Amino acid sequence: MKTVVFPGSFDPVTLGHIDLITRASKLAERVVIAVAVNTSKRTLFNLNERCDLLSEATAHLSGIEVIPFSGLLADFAKEHNAQALIRGIRGTTDADYELQLAQVNKALNSELETILLPANAATGFISSTVVKEVFKHNGDIDPFAPPCVKQALLIKHSENS
């Protein structure tokens, strides 16, 4: 497979995301990380910060591009000549939701497939919300997020203090 798209808000990127991106990079020559401009979500990190964190966290991988997007994911995938979307699933609730989204994206772009990757057991419980909550309560986020995220959270915390 030549190109896949891995979409998300990544607020912030976690080791679960990095695991999925690493696995996706073994399936395709090019992985486009589509960072969502989601106006309905209030994010801790702005779009540029989220893109920068992803670029830093994936610098060790080849064939990775980090690109912000808004609008329909099916259109974005087509613009970037992607054959498939990569979506991580942590359980049956995620699977049900992702299957619905896959059908919508297929209806919008008949050439587009969706690949559901089960989360790794070691990272499947990690979410961006978990990272932010553990950090907020002075917990160690090293097992959950790349080092650049810890630094960014420390900076964000000092700016807000």
Swiss-Prot record:
EC annotation from Swiss-Prot or TrEMBL: 2.7.7.3
Keyword set, alphabetical order: ATP-binding, Coenzyme A biosynthesis, Cytoplasm, Magnesium, Nucleotide-binding, Nucleotidyltransferase, Transferase
Pathway: Cofactor biosynthesis; coenzyme A biosynthesis; CoA from (R)-pantothenate: step 4/5
Chain positions of site Transition state stabilizer: 17
GO BP, sorted A to Z: coenzyme A biosynthetic process
Protein residues bound to substrate: 9, 41, 73, 87
GO annotations of cellular component type: cytoplasm
Binding site for ATP: 9-10, 17, 88-90, 98, 123-129
Subcellular location: Cytoplasm
Reaction equations catalysed: (R)-4'-phosphopantetheine + ATP + H(+) = 3'-dephospho-CoA + diphosphate
Leader sequence residues: none
Cofactor requirements of the protein: Mg(2+)
Keyword Nucleotidyltransferase applies: yes
Broad enzyme group: transferase
GO molecular function annotation: ATP binding; pantetheine-phosphate adenylyltransferase activity
Gene3D superfamilies the UniProt entry points to: HUPs (3.40.50.620)
Keyword Nucleotidyltransferase: yes
PANTHER family: PHOSPHOPANTETHEINE ADENYLYLTRANSFERASE
Matching NCBIfam families: coaD_prev_kdtB, cyt_tran_rel
HAMAP family reported in the protein's UniProt record: PPAT_bact
The family this protein is said to belong to: Belongs to the bacterial CoaD family.
Function: Reversibly transfers an adenylyl group from ATP to 4'-phosphopantetheine, yielding dephospho-CoA (dPCoA) and pyrophosphate.
Subunit structure: Homohexamer.
Designated name of the protein: Phosphopantetheine adenylyltransferase
Species of provenance: Psychromonas ingrahamii (strain DSM 17664 / CCUG 51855 / 37)
